Amino acid sequence: MTNRQWETLREYDEIKYEFYEGIAKVTINRPEVRNAFTPKTVSEMIDAFSRARDDQNVSVIVLTGEGDLAFCSGGDQKKRGHGGYVGEDQIPRLNVLDLQRLIRIIPKPVIAMVKGYAVGGGNVLNVVCDLTIAADNAIFGQTGPKVGSFDAGYGSGYLARIVGHKKAREIWYLCRQYNAQEALDMGLVNTVVPLEKVEDETVQWCKEIMKHSPTALRFLKAAMNADTDGLAGLQQMAGDATLLYYTTDEAKEGRDAFKEKRDPDFDQFPKFP
């Protein structure tokens, strides 16, 4: 593996947030519990992803877990209380749902770099990422029905879009675990590489993506999300279109005419068929 110097952009307690040549990397840093997340972990990830979204130097975001044994094993069951996962404020939450949605609406590609276990809520995080680079030691699966839990949102509905309804039901009903090759065969990941090469491969994919139009990628992501996200997906795509329209001379003419208290001259702009 190439020895890269990742720059720490912000210090957190339960995650790492780093940067390298246009790539932001968010790492769940709780290896002692196979990178299971708490409400605090999720809050920190939401903050880091929000910063990556706003950072003009970031083109692609990578989500991963600390160490080689686990990407993420889902919610920390020791923190699970009455009505959700209980944080330091003693309020039960399911704020990972907010994180899932954020990953979907960020107008930049998000790549899951999976080493070891991606199970339970960890597999759902893998599912909502745009792409997945898996190490050959990766293990995928859902555990919810074993521990009195389930994900009836992206973790089931969108999973079924990816792997097919029959396979998604198998994954949830049987709670089996699947190796990297099996995950590749069902379309749950994009590629499988040796563990020692997984970061090199992920960075290579990021660099290839960064050669392409960020606006085109933004609209492609929004378009592919729109059919599964209902009106919220259409709102996201419409918002992206509005932002792009604001950059045109036609939109600026309307704005300037209002500010200058005159009628806008829209006849000067082409009316494409």
UniProtKB/Swiss-Prot annotation:
Q: Which UniProt keywords apply?
A: Lyase, Menaquinone biosynthesis
Q: Which Gene3D superfamilies match?
A: 2-enoyl-CoA Hydratase, Chain A, domain 1, Lyase 2-enoyl-coa Hydratase, Chain A, domain 2
Ranges of Basic and acidic residues compositional bias?
254-265
Binding positions for hydrogencarbonate? Q142, T143, G144
Q: Name one GO biological process term.
A: menaquinone biosynthetic process
Where is the segment annotated Disordered?
Answer: 254-273
Instruction: Give GO MF terms, alphabetically.
Output: 1,4-dihydroxy-2-naphthoyl-CoA synthase activity
As recorded in UniProt, its EC number(s) are: 4.1.3.36
Tell me which cofactor or cofactors this protein depends on: hydrogencarbonate
Q: What is this protein called?
A: 1,4-dihydroxy-2-naphthoyl-CoA synthase
This chain is encoded by the gene named menB
